[in-house]
């Protein structure tokens, strides 16, 4: 979302900000980019806020923050932990704490006020809170990792096996591994004083669900996020004050396998096992008299097998309701037949989960129910999504119900799991009491549109066999519950459909990692975290998820500095599938992009040394500054089936990426004040650029390598092209697109750069032409062939995934190109906004908004033969440059007033635009054509 166009003729200038804000308030308080974070993993939290100002041109001139360990103190305007005093600063994003030392496990309260340029101050904001997590092992008060069973040491596979063939090679006798009982744990305790605060700190591996007195705590799904468990695991923090009752209380926990233990049954992409599922927990209870009570896991807890009889992140889940033990989560339950929990004597580093958890985001009802030729009942949910099903069923016998999810159907309407991993199913055995039961899987998920049911019939259908009857089957779309921050809609139905197509793929692959697909692999392939970053962040606030992704990459980094293609690295692939520069470079590119979007440089500070190690690794792999290995432009459109690059050498794309990494490192070194490093990376970048052009530029043909779209786009975007050749290379790119009848040939690496280069050079009409077609592989092709989420291949092949993240780069153009919301080159966190819509083709209007760290930005435009209208909203404490398609200011009005009379600076550019500089507020521009 950067605007790189230069400014030219200054036409008119008057003082900016003549209208000071008359009144303002502070709202949307955030600590570490979350409203009320619990269990922070830092003693130096950062505070952010936004300002609601009447009128226009609000600029913050100062702020004051109060932090206290008591809300009563704040009510009296006393910050006993930190009173910043009045600080002269316009910064309102990620202001660092500078008060007394914070304590692990403690909760704090804060509020803020600010001043405008005229010296007027706001009322104090509402009070917000944050709490600190457990920062060392001693903070856990002796809590142990407990389990129901001992680990089977001969079956431990912390480095996973890839697929069935490697499993057979490792275990030639075909022995099943990873088969442990799925445990549930309970512990009863007594409180006889008034509870002030109760907090649960819990990690259950692979996944857990926590209950107190029979009530599930929180709405999260698949907690905790998956990691490289021998390096670190995540714990969750829950405020459970309201769940603790006077007298006896019971904690109950159920565990699933997740990625911690993957059994060798049904489908598995990867086979890995760290041992039996296990639990570590501390419940800290603070009483009003100041005393504390800590309940921690140990051998005094009780354990039993749960009704979950099969749990696999890859193969599905089975649940037998007849194995339920009524009341086991409640006080008074007789657990004499339960086992004592076992101490595993296992250790790993525990970190607080700071990324947004997974939730059920949507419920999806069937659009059609029918019987297929196999006699199964098929539910068509109308949408391919990540998630599970929920069923309501009545049964007179304990009949096993098998539920097959699938993206596609074969011609006979049976499920097609070829591209999504087979066999996978949900299994449920109801009780035989004739009562309605509700069930949904707890510890697995899949990507699907269709559901085929065996062993049950829809209620009201013929049921001669007396099978269980399903009163309702609903799809539950599960994904990372990151805030939606961007919206886009335009007058062209096809583009709105493409927007939805990409959005479903983004949502379906936002888990605790950014997966490639929500079924077959569920792995954190790293290339998409930077190639898709702008597109994803236009729609969702991923600031917290990327903090986890960076930690995953650091945990996966090898001794020689190599960053593998996936993180967490649950399996070691081979060749380019383990080590490819365009994938590992996410470790360099991601934190730079995070800094630009959110103003967060802490990731750069934290991982700078390890990022240097990766640059050194790439340098060690280079031959005369050329890096030539890996997968290259994956999934490009060549003569062969999709896969490794066909039209562009991996040397060109890898070296271009290497150069881009080095130039980012130079910028980050300057940001951190590391002048010697900045000089070193400048010199290295110059050497790579020279070598790149020497190797790949063909002076006789005036083109890069084979003149592929990817070669031209990457060279232009990375600024590898000498200035005298830039126009020629741009012409080559556009010419190749036209020669291919406006079709793309790039893969997932090249396409994002192609879109960016065309937009930067105001060639959005070319982007429009490329995506306004149905008859060649691309988005229109996928839609024409029935896709409801982005597919793995441009061709939408049925044998590949039909819900895949990696090719959704047009989403970024919808927001920054067609919609026109971006930021200036040197802007951070959208402090200096650029509104520059590029209408294209027959699109007559577009409505675009983005909730930036400073507040909401709006760009709504509409054009006709007579005029062009643009409604703009800029948040307080930010400014904007607005591009209007006219060179004569006499043709421009704002809210009915001629631009020359509107007290707004403006200037002309490129004999095409008038650029108006505005402050915060709402504006309505009209340009007569």
Residue spans for each PLM region:
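Bacterial Sec-dependent N-terminal signal peptides
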Residues: 1-25
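Extracellular/oxidizing-compartment recognition motifs
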Residues: 24-107, 111-520, 528, 544-547, ...
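Alpha-helix capping and helix-loop boundary segments enriched in small/acidic/polar residues
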Residues: 173-180, 199, 217, 225-229, ...
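Alpha-helical support elements that line or immediately flank enzyme active sites
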Residues: 198-202, 212, 388-407, 451-456, ...
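Active-site acid/base region of carbohydrate-active enzymes
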Residues: 207, 298-305, 450, 458-501, ...
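Helix-terminus loop motifs that line ligand-binding clefts
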Residues: 215, 219-230, 411-425, 543-644, ...
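C-terminal capping/lid segments that line or modulate ligand- or cofactor-binding pockets
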Residues: 251, 319-320, 521, 539, ...
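Non-catalytic C-terminal accessory modules of carbohydrate-active enzymes
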Residues: 271, 275-282, 294-332, 351-363, ...
């Amino acid at each position: 979302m950067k605007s790189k166009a230069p400014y030219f003729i200054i036409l008119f200038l008057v003082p900016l900000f003549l209208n000071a804000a008359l009144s303002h308030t502070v709202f949307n308080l955030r600590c570490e980019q979350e409203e009320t974070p619990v269990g922070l993993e830092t003693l130096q939290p950062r505070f952010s806020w936004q300002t609601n100002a009447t009128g226009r041109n609000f600029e913050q001139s100062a702020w004051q923050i109060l932090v206290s360990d008591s809300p009563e103190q704040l009510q009296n305007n006393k910050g006993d932990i930190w009173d910043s005093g009045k600080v002269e600063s316009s910064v309102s994003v990620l202001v660092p704490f500078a008060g007394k030392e914070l304590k692990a496990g403690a909760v704090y309260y804060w509020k803020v006020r600010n001043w405008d340029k005229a010296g007027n101050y706001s009322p104090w904001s509402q009070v917000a809170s944050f709490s600190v997590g457990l920062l060392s092992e001693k903070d856990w008060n002796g809590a142990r990792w407990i389990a129901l069973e001992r680990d089977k040491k001969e079956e431990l596979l912390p480095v996973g096996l890839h697929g069935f063939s490697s499993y057979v090679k490792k275990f030639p006798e075909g022995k099943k591994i990873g088969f442990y009982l799925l445990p549930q744990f309970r512990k009863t305790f007594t409180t006889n004083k008034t509870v002030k605060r109760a907090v649960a700190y819990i990690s259950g591996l692979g996944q857990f669900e926590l209950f107190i007195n029979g009530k599930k705590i929180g709405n999260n799904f698949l907690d905790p996020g998956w990691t490289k468990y021998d390096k670190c695991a995540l714990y969750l923090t829950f405020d459970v004050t309201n769940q603790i009752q006077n007298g006896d209380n019971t904690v109950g926990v159920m565990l699933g396998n997740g990625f911690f233990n993957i059994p060798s049954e049904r489908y598995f992409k990867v086979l890995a096992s760290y041992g039996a599922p296990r639990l570590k927990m501390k419940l800290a209870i603070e009483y009003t008299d100041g005393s504390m009570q800590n309940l921690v896991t140990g051998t005094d807890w009780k354990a039993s097998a749960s009704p979950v009889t099969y749990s696999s992140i890859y193969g599905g889940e089975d649940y037998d309701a007849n194995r339920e033990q009524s009341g086991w989560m409640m006080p008074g339950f007789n657990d004499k037949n339960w086992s004592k929990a076992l101490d595993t004597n296992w250790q790993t580093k525990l970190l607080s989960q700071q990324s947004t958890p997974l939730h059920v985001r949507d419920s999806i009802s069937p659009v059609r129910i029918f019987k297929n030729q196999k006699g199964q009942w098929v539910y068509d949910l109308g949408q391919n999504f990540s998630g599970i099903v929920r069923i309501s069923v009545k049964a007179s016998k304990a009949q096993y119900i098998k539920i097959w999810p699938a993206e596609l159907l074969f011609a006979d309407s049976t499920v097609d799991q070829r591209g999504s991993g087979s066999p996978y199913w949900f299994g449920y055995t109801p009780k035989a009491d004739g009562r309605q039961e509700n069930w949904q899987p707890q510890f697995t998920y899949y990507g699907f549109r269709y559901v085929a049911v065996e062993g049950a019939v829809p209620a009201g259908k013929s049921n001669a066999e007396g099978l269980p009857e399903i009163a309702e089957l609903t799809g539950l779309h599960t994904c990372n519950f990151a805030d939606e921050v961007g919206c886009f809609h335009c007058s062209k139905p096809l583009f709105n459909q493409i927007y939805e197509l990409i959005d479903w793929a983004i949502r379906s692959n936002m888990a605790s990692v950014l997966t490639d697909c929500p079924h077959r692999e569920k792995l954190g392939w790293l290339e998409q975290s930077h190639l898709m970053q702008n597109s994803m962040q236009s729609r969702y606030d991923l600031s917290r998820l990327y903090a986890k992704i960076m930690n995953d990459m650091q945990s996966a980094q090898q001794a020689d500095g190599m960053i593998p293609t996936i993180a967490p690295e649950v399996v070691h692939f081979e060749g380019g599938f383990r080590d490819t520069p365009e994938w590992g470079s996410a470790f360099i590119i991601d934190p730079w992009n995070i800094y630009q979007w959110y103003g967060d440089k802490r990731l750069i500070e934290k991982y700078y040394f390890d990022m240097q190690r990766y640059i050194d690794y790439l340098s060690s792999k280079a031959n005369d500054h050329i890096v030539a290995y890996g997968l290259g432009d994956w999934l490009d459109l060549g003569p062969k089936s999709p896969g490794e690059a066909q039209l562009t050498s991996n040397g060109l794309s890898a070296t271009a990426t290497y150069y881009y990494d080095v130039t980012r490192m130079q910028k980050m070194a300057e940001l951190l004040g590391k002048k010697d490093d900045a000089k070193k990376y400048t010199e290295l970048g110059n050497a790579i650029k020279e070598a790149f052009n020497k190797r790949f530029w063909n002076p006789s043909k005036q083109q890069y390598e084979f003149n592929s779209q990817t070669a031209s786009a990457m060279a232009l975007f990375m600024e590898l092209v000498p200035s005298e050749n830039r126009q020629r290379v741009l012409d080559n790119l556009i010419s190749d697109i036209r020669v291919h009848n406006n079709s793309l040939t790039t893969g997932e690496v090249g396409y994002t750069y192609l879109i960016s280069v065309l937009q930067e050079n105001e060639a959005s009409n070319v982007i429009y032409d490329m995506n306004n077609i149905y008859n060649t592989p691309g988005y229109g092709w996928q839609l024409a062939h029935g896709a409801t989420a982005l597919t793995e291949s441009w061709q939408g092949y049925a044998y590949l995934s039909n819900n895949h993240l990696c090719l959704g780069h047009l989403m970024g153009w919808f927001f920054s190109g067609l919609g026109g919301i971006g930021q200036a080159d040197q802007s951070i966190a959208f402090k200096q906004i650029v509104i520059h819509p590029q209408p294209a083709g027959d699109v007559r209007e577009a409505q675009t908004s983005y909730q930036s760290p400073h507040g909401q930005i709006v760009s709504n435009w509409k054009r006709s033969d007579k005029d062009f209208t643009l409604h703009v909203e800029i948040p307080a404490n930010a400014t904007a440059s607005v591009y209007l398609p006219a060179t004569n200011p006499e043709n421009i009005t704002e809210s009915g007033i001629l631009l020359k009379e509107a007290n707004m600076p403006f200037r002309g550019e490129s004999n095409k635009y008038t650029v108006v500089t505005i402050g915060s507020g709402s504006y309505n521009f009209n340009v007569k054509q």
